[in-house]
């Protein structure tokens, strides 16, 4: 089971019950009921985001990584040629639907078109891992160097109880004129 509290305070978790029928020699000879203990957990209030990220979405996780992948090397594009960039965020302890959308930047001389995201969830030995991949098609409409700003995603490390920021560095695309 995974529990995602929606408010702070004390939460009581009722016992889980499992009922089984006992078979002997192909016949039902009785039933067994197994019951776990009940639990009470304390859900802390959401800590304030750092001042530089005051509008940050609440994204608690045990681990969070961000990476990008390009359809090809973006160092020498020609005007009108498309290229795609995938940005993948992987968060341990979070559902894929809770990972926020990374809005594409506005860059002069570059048209950027977001595509439908790919959402995935994996069960790992230490919890659920949500994975969100946003894909962006980019087309240079003017020759020159085009700077994509760094991508920053604030998140709260639940083990260290502190805000962190996952970052992709600034990237320069060189758009060459068409012959």
Language model features with spans:
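Surface-exposed interaction/ligand-binding surfaces
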Residues: 1-179
């Amino acid at each position: 089971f995974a529990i995602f509290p929606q408010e702070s305070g004390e939460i009581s978790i009722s016992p889980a019950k499992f009922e089984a029928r006992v078979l002997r020699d192909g016949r039902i000879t009785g039933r067994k009921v197994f019951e776990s203990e009940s639990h009470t957990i304390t859900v802390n209030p959401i800590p304030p985001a750092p001042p530089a990220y005051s509008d940050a979405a609440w994204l608690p996780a045990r681990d969070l990584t961000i990476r990008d992948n390009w359809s090809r090397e973006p160092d020498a594009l020609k005007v009108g040629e498309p290229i795609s960039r995938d940005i993948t965020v992987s968060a341990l302890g979070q559902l894929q639907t809770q990972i926020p959308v990374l809005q594409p930047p506005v860059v002069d001389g570059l048209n950027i078109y977001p595509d439908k995201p790919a959402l995935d969830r994996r069960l790992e030995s230490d919890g659920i891992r949500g994975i969100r991949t946003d894909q962006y098609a980019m087309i240079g409409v003017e020759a020159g160097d085009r700077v994509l700003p760094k991508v920053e995603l604030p998140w709260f490390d639940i083990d260290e109880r502190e805000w962190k920021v996952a970052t992709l560095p600034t990237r320069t695309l060189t758009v060459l004129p068409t012959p």
